[in-house]
Amino acid sequence: MQMIPGDPFSISSSMGGFVHQETHLHHLQQQIPDLNPNSNPNPNAKPNSSSAKKKRNQPGTPDPDADVIALSPTTLMATNRFVCEICNKGFQRDQNLQLHRRGHNLPWKLKQRSKQEVIKKKVYICPIKTCVHHDASRALGDLTGIKKHYSRKHGEKKWKCEKCSKKYAVQSDWKAHAKTCGTREYKCDCGTLFSRKDSFITHRAFCDALTEEGARMSSLSNNNPVISTTNLNFGNESNVMNNPNLPHGFVHRGVHHPDINAAISQFGLGFGHDLSAMHAQGLSEMVQMASTGNHHLFPSSSSSLPDFSGHHQFQIPMTSTNPSLTLSSSSTSQQTSASLQHQTLKDSSFSPLFSSSSENKQNKPLSPMSATALLQKAAQMGSTRSNSSTAPSFFAGPTMTSSSATASPPPRSSSPMMIQQQLNNFNTNVLRENHNRAPPPLSGVSTSSVDNNPFQSNRSGLNPAQQMGLTRDFLGVSNEHHPHQTGRRPFLPQELARFAPLG
């Protein structure tokens, strides 16, 4: 076997036909360059594809060797710079005019440049002095560009889109917009759709700002739970009433609404009952009864209400010997009733002070009462007190109000007999002090409206002593059962003689 030394492809002479082919293939592989794109035999070589491209100057950065041309606005925007003297047809370029002159068999001449002539570029500046492109260093490169710039920035927008009402100063811009108007939609993250890109960009800026502000406020609320509670519970008094950590009688009174719901919440906490389920109709009936002169309805319905004699708004000097005086039905009486109704609602806000102070001593919450039960109890108490035909407790004199204003809150339970005896004591003192002098007239009060009060009977025909009727202490035993009451005495013989016709 003959071997070819140094040849890795050498084989035996029996395969001599293939040796020549393999040698020739190996020689060709060394001469043909590597066609693998991943391999780079010369890593220092740089691709010249980008350098072969001619870079275009950015707008506003002209060639410093270019000729700067300044045109007036009239010349710049003129549509017919070159006019034919035969047909008055205008052309924007002189070359077009020369070709047109050839049609009239006129001499024409086209500009021809010699090979030695150096072609210099021309740049155009904006005719507006305040424009940034008025400077030669910011000149625009061609005549068409300076015309469009002047029209867009300083010209009138003559073309208007019928779909979106957007106006354009350049007709080509208007045509390009008309092709795509309404075909594309820009959707914001908040779900709003826009057909115009500029409107979408403006909205997106505000929307992102609002989103960031909302995220910042939510982070502050999460870091400070007090702020979040304050922001989320405006006017929510149910949370305050149902909060077991707050003391009894605590009311959030940051905002007072004049509607009936605010009155229900105030009366509910003032009485010490849970009157959240009270119907508005029942409360309106109570307010209406109070406005017609039934002023003893509220003090007698619950002991948690403040004593009206202790508030100086209701201090009316009572020097008349006729204890059956009531508010008249005139316009003055209506104004007084309205003011008393408003003051009743206003003073009910002070009731938690009395209820909380008394409940510190007695931790016995009152049972809830419905509106119907409350009205029935008020009517029962009013009918019991109507036997005395006297004024309400807040018509007491200055001596009585001064003592009650500094006294402790009224007791929890007040029977009709105790109230009746207090009123009789007051009437006795009035009769004793003002027996020999005439009563001065009381403004806004008359005796002709006795029938207007459903809780009082008509006793206008009786004198003050006879109107006391059977409520006098004939036996003089009141001090035995009630030693804390003073000023009670039995009847004198001459006083008993006045009641003889009643028997």
Swiss-Prot record:
Binding site for Zn(2+) 1: 161, 164, 177, 181
Low complexity bias locations: 32-51, 319-358, 396-407
Renumbered zinc finger spans (C2H2-type): 82-104, 124-154, 159-182
Region (Disordered): 32-68, 301-417, 432-465
SUPFAM superfamilies tied to this protein: beta-beta-alpha zinc fingers (SSF57667)
Main subcellular location: nucleus
Tissue expression: Expressed in the quiescent center, the ground tissue stem cells and to a lesser extent in mature cortex and endodermis cells.
PTM annotation (Phosphoserine): residues: 72
PROSITE patterns: ZINC_FINGER_C2H2_1, ZINC_FINGER_C2H2_2
SMART domains listed in its UniProt record: ZnF_C2H2
Motif segment (Nuclear localization signal 2): 146-153
Annotated segments matching region SHR-binding: 196-208
Subunit structure: Interacts with SHR, SCR, MGP and itself. The heterodimer with SHR involves its zinc fingers. Interacts with SIEL. Binds to RGA and SCL3 competitively in the nucleus.
Name this protein carries in UniProt: Zinc finger protein JACKDAW
Organism: Arabidopsis thaliana (Mouse-ear cress)
Protein's gene: JKD
